[in-house]
UniProtKB/Swiss-Prot annotation:
Induction: By growth factors. Up-regulated in lung vasculature in response to reperfusion after ischemia. Up-regulated in liver in response to partial hepatectomy. GO terms for molecular function: DNA binding; DNA-binding transcription activator activity, RNA polymerase II-specific; DNA-binding transcription factor activity; double-stranded methylated DNA binding; enzyme binding; hemi-methylated DNA-binding; histone acetyltransferase binding; promoter-specific chromatin binding. The gene is Egr1. Keywords: Activator, Biological rhythms, Cytoplasm, DNA-binding, Isopeptide bond, Metal-binding, Nucleus, Repeat, Transcription, Transcription regulation, Ubl conjugation, Zinc, Zinc-finger. It comes from Mus musculus. A zinc finger (C2H2-type) spans 336-360, 366-388, 394-416. Residues 68-77 have a biased composition (Gly residues). It is found in: Nucleus; Cytoplasm. Binds to DNA motifs with the sequence 5'-GCG(T/G)GGGCG-3' via its C2H2-type zinc fingers. The first, most N-terminal zinc finger binds to the 3'-GCG motif, the middle zinc finger interacts with the central TGG motif, and the C-terminal zinc finger binds to the 5'-GCG motif. Binds double-stranded target DNA, irrespective of the cytosine methylation status. Has reduced affinity for target DNA where the cytosines have been oxidized to 5-hydroxymethylcytosine. Does not bind target DNA where the cytosines have been oxidized to 5-formylcytosine or 5-carboxylcytosine. SUPFAM superfamilies: beta-beta-alpha zinc fingers. This is Early growth response protein 1.
Length: 533
C-alpha cells in the first residue's frame, strides 16, 4: 500500500505536468490571463498534491477504502474527486479553467483578441532570450551584408532550436507582448531589444495606427539588422533626398548672399552692410521674383564686387572735389556720415544716408513686379512703372504735351524758352533793318514819283491850253537869253497840241517836258531831298 501511495505521489506530478506540455494549442488558447493561470497551476501542483496526500495518510486510503473496505470516508471523497481509480488525474478540477477563463478573456481582454489574429506566434519565455541575442549579435553581420537572406537563415535556425509549436503562448507581461509582436512582425523584433525604443514598439497592439503611419517604410527596410543598421543604410536615402531638396533652396537666397556680404565687407566697408544685404531678400515676396533671384544668384556676387570696385575707383575723384566745394549746410547740421572709410559724405537725414549707402553696396531692393527690374530708389521704381501703365501726369503749360516724369517736362519747357529767346533775337535784329529800310525808300519815293506826278499834269494842261507858250518861254528866256531858243519854243507848242490830240499818251509829252525842264526840277526839288536826308 505504501509503495502504491508513493507511486501515485510520484506519478501524479508527472501526469499533471504532461497535460500542460501536451495540451493542444489553438489560437483561442493564446491569451495572457489563461497563461497566467496555467503557470500558477504548474508551479503550485506539488503543493496541491502534498495537501491532497496528507488526508490520505491520516484519514484513510482512497484506494484501500474502495478496494479493501478501509475507513476514512473524507479521504476517499477527496481522492475520488481528484484522481481516477487508475491513479490518473480527473478532468473535473480543470473544467472551470477551460470554460470560465475563455469567457472572461473573450469579453474583457481586447489585447488578446487583437493578437489572436496572428497565427505565427513562436515565442515563450526561452525565445525572449534568443531574440535578445539575435538582435544584438547580427549587427556586424548586417553591416557586412545589406540583404536579409542570411538573417532569414539565422531566424530559421533560432526558431528550429526553440520548441516546435508555433501557436504557443508567452509570458504574462508587457515584455511578453513586445516579444509576441516582435515574433509577429520580424522588423519589430529586430528593433525592440536593441535600444530604448522598446516602449514605442511594445505599444503596437494598443496604438496600431501610429505604427502603421510612422514606421511603414522603416519596418520594411530596418529588417536586415538592428536599428543602428537601419539608420546606417536605408534611411540615408530619405535624408539624402530631403537634403538635396532643401540645399538648393536655401543657398539660392541666403548662403551666397552671406558669402558675398563677407567678401564685400572685408576690404573697406563696415560690417552692418552685410546685414542690409541679408535683409534684402525678404522684400522679394512673389514666387516669380524668388525664381528670378535664384537664377541670378550666381552672377549677383560678381555684380556686387564690380560695384564695389567701381565705387573704389570713383571715390578718389569725389574725394578731390568735395573738400574744395563748400556745402549748402554746415557740417554740424549734417550728423549722418557715410560709414565707408574712403567716402566723406555727410547727410542731414537718415534716409538720405541709406540711399547713399546703396551706391556703395549696389543694393536694389525695389523691384518692378512686371519686368522684374530692380531699382535702388522707390521714386525710380514709381516712374518706371509708368512706362508700363502709360500714365503721364505731367503736362506742358505751353503746348500741352504730357510726360511721365517731371524732369522730362522741365527739359521740354527749356525747348520753349530757347524758342522764345531765338524769336526775341530775331526781332531785335529785324528792328534796325526796318529803320534802315525806311530811310532809303523815302528819297526814292520823293525823287521819282513826285516828278512823275508833277510832270504829267503840267504838260497836259500846257498841251491843251495856250499858256504853254507862256510857261516855257519864260524860263527859256531867263535861262537862255538867246532869241533863237524862244522862237523855237514858240514854234514847238503849236505842233505839240496836235500830237497830243492825235496821241493821248501823256508819257511821251511828260518825257519831253522833263527833259526840257530838267534844270527847273533840280532847282525846285533839291531842298526837299536835303531835308529828308
Amino acid at each position: 500500500m505504501a509503495a502504491a501511495k508513493a507511486e501515485m505521489q510520484l506519478m501524479s506530478p508527472l501526469q499533471i505536468s504532461d497535460p500542460f506540455g501536451s495540451f493542444p494549442h489553438s489560437p483561442t488558447m493564446d491569451n495572457y490571463p489563461k497563461l497566467e493561470e496555467m503557470m500558477l497551476l504548474s508551479n503550485g501542483a506539488p503543493q496541491f498534491l502534498g495537501a491532497a496526500g496528507t488526508p490520505e495518510g491520516s484519514g484513510g486510503n482512497s484506494s484501500s477504502s474502495t478496494s479493501s473496505g478501509g475507513g476514512g470516508g473524507g479521504g476517499s471523497n477527496s481522492g475520488s474527486s481528484a484522481f481516477n481509480p487508475q491513479g490518473e488525474p480527473s478532468e473535473q478540477p480543470y473544467e472551470h479553467l477551460t470554460t470560465e477563463s475563455f469567457s472572461d478573456i473573450a469579453l474583457n481582454n481586447e489585447k488578446a483578441m487583437v493578437e489572436t489574429s496572428y497565427p505565427s506566434q513562436t515565442t515563450r519565455l526561452p525565445p525572449i532570450t534568443y531574440t535578445g541575442r539575435f538582435s544584438l549579435e547580427p549587427a556586424p553581420n548586417s553591416g557586412n551584408t545589406l540583404w536579409p537572406e542570411p538573417l532569414f537563415s539565422l531566424v530559421s535556425g533560432l526558431v528550429s532550436m526553440t520548441n516546435p509549436p508555433t501557436s504557443s503562448s508567452s509570458a504574462p507581461s508587457p515584455a511578453a507582448s513586445s516579444s509576441s509582436s516582435a515574433s509577429q512582425s520580424p522588423p519589430l523584433s529586430c528593433a525592440v531589444p536593441s535600444n530604448d525604443s522598446s516602449p514605442i514598439y511594445s505599444a503596437a497592439p494598443t496604438f496600431p495606427t501610429p505604427n502603421t503611419d510612422i514606421f511603414p517604410e522603416p519596418q520594411s527596410q530596418a529588417f536586415p539588422g538592428s536599428a543602428g543598421t537601419a539608420l546606417q543604410y536605408p534611411p540615408p536615402a530619405y535624408p539624402a533626398t530631403k537634403g538635396g531638396f532643401q540645399v538648393p533652396m536655401i543657398p539660392d537666397y541666403l548662403f551666397p548672399q552671406q558669402q558675398g556680404d563677407l567678401s564685400l565687407g572685408t576690404p573697406d566697408q563696415k560690417p552692418f552692410q552685410g546685414l542690409e544685404n541679408r535683409t534684402q531678400q525678404p522684400s522679394l515676396t512673389p514666387l516669380s521674383t524668388i525664381k528670378a533671384f535664384a537664377t541670378q544668384s550666381g552672377s549677383q556676387d560678381l555684380k556686387a564686387l564690380n560695384t564695389t570696385y567701381q565705387s573704389q575707383l570713383i571715390k578718389p575723384s569725389r574725394m578731390r572735389k568735395y573738400p574744395n566745394r563748400p556745402s549748402k549746410t554746415p557740417p554740424h547740421e549734417r550728423p549722418y556720415a557715410c560709414p565707408v572709410e574712403s567716402c566723406d559724405r555727410r547727410f542731414s537725414r537718415s534716409d538720405e544716408l541709406t540711399r547713399h549707402i546703396r551706391i556703395h553696396t549696389g543694393q536694389k531692393p525695389f523691384q518692378c513686379r512686371i519686368c522684374m527690374r530692380n531699382f535702388s530708389r522707390s521714386d525710380h521704381l514709381t516712374t518706371h512703372i509708368r512706362t508700363h501703365t502709360g500714365e503721364k501726369p505731367f503736362a506742358c503749360d505751353i503746348c500741352g504735351r504730357k510726360f511721365a516724369r517731371s524732369d522730362e517736362r522741365k527739359r521740354h519747357t527749356k525747348i520753349h524758352l530757347r524758342q522764345k529767346d531765338k524769336k526775341a533775337d530775331k526781332s531785335v535784329v529785324a528792328s534796325p533793318a526796318a529803320s534802315s529800310l525806311s530811310s532809303y525808300p523815302s528819297p526814292v519815293a520823293t525823287s521819282y514819283p513826285s516828278p512823275a506826278t508833277t510832270s504829267f499834269p503840267s504838260p497836259v494842261p500846257t498841251s491843251y491850253s495856250s499858256p504853254g507858250s507862256s510857261t516855257y518861254p519864260s524860263p527859256a528866256h531867263s535861262g537862255f537869253p538867246s532869241p533863237s531858243v524862244a522862237t523855237t519854243f514858240a514854234s514847238v507848242p503849236p505842233a505839240f497840241p496836235t500830237q497830243v490830240s492825235s496821241f493821248p499818251s501823256a508819257g511821251v509829252s511828260s518825257s519831253f517836258s522833263t527833259s526840257t525842264g530838267l534844270s527847273d526840277m533840280t532847282a525846285t526839288f533839291s531842298p526837299r531831298t536835303i531835308e529828308i536826308c
